[in-house]
């Protein structure tokens, strides 16, 4: 959660002050189901003074020496990692969460639909950063109303990411579904129903690719959807 590192530090500083002792805070790093742990383990000396802080969202090991003076122990200064911006933290959390979820679920590859919009572009970028371009397949699924601008944007992203891609037209599938429903829809105005058929077809084709090639299917919707 945003602001969690600052809250964590404040609580631990207060604990160090209360006990008048050095404090070692160890934190898991990586994703576990829907939880993402940011690492960033740290050591505070008596009085809450920071001695060591390890990186966020990275596995790290550091040898720390303690010294005694006048009967009081303190850690010698070491790495002091500076947390990145909140937006950078958000991106790293999504990247680490995706990577660990895919791997711990027994997959090594992913597949996703690429529309040319910002949602799927961000998911594709996170996937490539997390798993490597060779393990990501992006699929364009155009219909007869797909704009050239959207298709070009999708192609530009694929060129930049250097990941595998395929293009599968959904026009034939869409026509088959509409024809199957034509007698029931006769006399009714075209509305969101026909639009939603497109997304259902895309989902069906992407799931087929996922099943056939053993790739995890990534969704690309945002909270508004």
Q: Which residues make up each language-model segment?
A:
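Hydrophobic/aromatic beta-strand patches that form the interior of the parallel beta-sheet core
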Residues: 22-26, 42, 137-139, 166-168, ...
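A conserved beta-strand->alpha-helix junction
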Residues: 58-68, 135-193, 199
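Phosphate/ATP-binding catalytic cores across multiple sugar-kinase/actin-like superfamilies
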Residues: 89-111, 205-209
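ATP-dependent adenylation/pyrophosphate-handling site
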Residues: 108-114, 118-155
